[in-house]
Regions:
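Flexible, low-complexity junctional segments that flank or bridge functional domains
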Residues: 2-11, 15-243, 249-253, 267, ...
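C-terminal "post-core" interaction segments
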Residues: 30-36, 52, 201-450
């Protein structure tokens, strides 16, 4: 069975995304791919002494282990060990995990809404998904989960830790977390939910300025985003002056979707050649691949600001990197997660498979973001601006408007609108300073383009 779709790696209710390629994803380019680098290493037979050593290990385990062990369990564990010893993103997919993987793009699942990985024997949070129990509770990217309920995660596999987090919707679980900069452990009591993820959210954030948040990259994210842009254009009277694309806490997903999203805002460079979106390099036949822009910029070069943070990973970094390197958008926020590897799902049979790191991806400038991340053009940290008490009226601020019987200005409605907008901006500054900064930059770019 070939997996022809590009599935995000779902750790069931915890929901872990990785960037993956389908086996047939580069079929159109295979004829031009140099596979000479793979021939010597992939066709060489495994040395007989290694096969014998492996067989001896199985024999000793079956004879002397404290209790009888099923052959299937031994082989499953052997495959799992081979994969986990390579890197944090390669893994064995047993029947349950393989099934979860194939159904994960529906956008609905039960759990906490965390993407996690294993680091030094501890579960590390890559990102909490927006509007999920973990996000609402305040769990952050980079947090380390050290206890699940009363059980320590030390010594557990990632799968075992995930299984402990699973449970019936409505049931509770306590997570104990270590956070950088905090000198004591934090505890969070979470209620599991059936999580429905809408990957595209949009609104007019200010007159003439649109806002789109991509929470992940699903199969229909590109199409849904284009429809959202059409709605924003209609809501702005056909004059969309600029767009904020929010990729914060977006753990990634489908490579094809990331390419579609990037392509919507790119076109041809000054020389008339299609702009590069992303390239991948690896040993799998067809994995040396470059994606080029095919269409026309749907915003007709209207200014853009892209928001990223440490929770922006994988496919989200592809989009940010493509728009940054092609100088299509200003990137604002904090450095992204830095996952620059590509995983391919290789079925072993009808029910199991392996998820194997097969390539690294590169931004249009040829830069790998693996363990480095996308560095924003404008660094704006997540800060909380405290709301201060209203200032007393200035006793010297006396004007015509204070005079009894003054003439009424016919533009009072516009003045009221301006005051209301200022109040909205003040509220935005307190609630989401990064978004406030992005809108301020976007408005400045739009004015400069007049």
């Amino acid at each position: 069975m070939l997996i022809k779709k590009l599935y995000p790696c779902t750790l069931a209710i915890v929901y872990a995304f990785t960037l993956m390629l389908p086996l047939t994803g580069f079929a159109d380019d295979e004829a031009n791919t140099d596979t000479s680098t793979t021939s010597s290493s992939t066709t060489k037979a495994v040395p007989l002494e290694d096969v014998q050593r492996f067989s001896n290990a199985i024999g000793e385990i079956k004879k002397y282990y404290v209790k009888p062990v099923d052959d299937k369990e031994l082989f499953d564990n052997a495959i799992r060990g081979m994969l986990t010893g390579l890197d944090p993103h390669s893994s064995y997919l047993d029947e349950e995990e393989f099934k979860d993987l194939q159904t994960s793009t529906s956008g609905e699942f039960g759990g906490l809404g965390l993407e996690v990985t294993m680091e030094d024997g501890v579960v590390k949070v890559v990102t909490p998904l927006v509007d999920t129990p973990a996000f609402k509770a305040g769990i952050k990217s980079g947090d380390y989960i050290i206890k699940l309920g009363k059980e320590s995660v030390q010594g557990l596999s990632l799968k075992d830790a995930v299984n402990l987090m699973r449970g019936k919707a409505g049931s509770t679980i306590q997570l104990t977390i270590l956070r950088k900069g905090v000198n004591k452990a934090l505890t969070f009591d979470l209620i599991r939910e059936i999580i429905q993820i809408k990957s595209v959210q949009s609104k007019i954030i200010a007159p003439g300025y649109g806002y789109i948040r991509l929470t992940q990259f699903q199969a229909l994210t590109g199409k849904d985003m284009l429809q959202a842009i059409d709605r924003l254009k209609q809501q702005s009277g056909g004059n969309l002056k600029g767009l904020i694309l929010d990729l914060r806490n977006n753990p990634g997903g489908l490579l094809d979707s990331a390419i579609q999203v990037s392509d919507a805002f790119l076109g041809k460079d000054k020389s008339g050649k299609p702009e590069t979106i992303v390239s991948t390099k690896g040993r799998l036949p067809g994995s040396d691949f470059t994606a080029l822009a095919k269409g026309v910029d749907v915003l007709h070069n209207a200014p853009m600001v892209v928001l990223i943070n440490n929770g922006s990973a994988s496919a989200a970094e592809i989009v940010a990197g493509a728009l940054k390197d092609n100088k299509r958008a200003v990137i604002l926020g904090t450095t992204s997660f830095g996952k620059g590897s590509v995983q391919t799902v290789l079925p072993l049979d009808e029910k199991t498979g392996i998820k194997l790191t097969t390539a690294l991806y590169y931004t249009p400038s040829g830069t790998s973001i693996q363990a480095q991340g996308i560095v924003p053009d404008i660094v704006v940290n997540e800060v909380e601006i405290p709301k201060t008490a209203a200032k007393p009226a200035d006793p010297t601020g006396y004007s015509e408007a204070n005079l009894s019987g003054h003439l009424i200005n016919k533009n009072n409605k516009e003045i009221t609108k301006a005051k209301n907008f200022k109040a909205q901006m003040d509220e935005l500054m307190h609630n989401d300073y990064q978004l406030y900064a992005a809108l301020t930059v976007l408005e400045g770019m739009a004015l400069a383009n007049r």
